[in-house]
Amino acid sequence: MKRLDDQTVVGRYMHPQAYGFNWGDKGDKVQFVRSNTMEVIGDEKVIAEITPYDKETIQGAKEFKITFVNPLDAAISENEGFGIENLEWCPEVYFADNVIRNNRARGTLFSTPLKTVVERNVFDHTSGTAILLCGDSIGWFETGACRDVTIRENKFINSLTNLFQFTEAVISIYPEIPNLKDQVKYFHGGEGYPGVIIENNQFETFDRPIVFAKSIDGLTFRGNKVVQNEDFPAFHSNKTRFRLLRAKNVVIENNEFSDGDASVSEE
């Protein structure tokens, strides 16, 4: 991203497999995210004008000149990396009554700040994590934080049989944050939002990790049943049910563990 003046930037599609289509329209609300800490900088901005910058038309364009109605925050410049998230183009998600089976990588991936409900699904032998809540502005450039996610009444059968990307647990809340130690705000959840609620699910697992969560304010795990089996040899380096990195307002209650292991590690 390059700042041209106090109200104008040139934004660029960064991933080589995603460009050449419209990014935003006049009147759209956007926010700026510092790539290094994945924190929102300044207030929401409204697009006054947006045009292709490196091409005459949108087709094939990688760069857009974007002018905003109001001035930008002084911290936003090309001296450090920023992502621009279009808040108008974020969907609500209802994902229900599906069978997700034998995936090579993750079973499902959700990355939207709007309401997301995942219910009554069967996640059967997903090779990687069954459910991934991600977010990044350095590789895939999927910036969206999750504010309101409910995961309920699903069945997980021997997920996490391999170690692909983001395979920290059956449910992996894994934003990529290069400089986590200097992060002040939290990425997922946040004050005034429900955060992530995982309730009334059944986990059948041969290994230990059930939930991994990083940079989240608001995580509830309640009323779930975890059934340990010996279908495969346990192999994961994470030996705890719940591994938390910079997590706040976490509730783990009223769950059933067939082997009594409800271990938690906090970092």
List the predicted regions and their residue ranges:
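Extracellular parallel beta-helix/beta-solenoid repeat domains
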Residues: 1-267
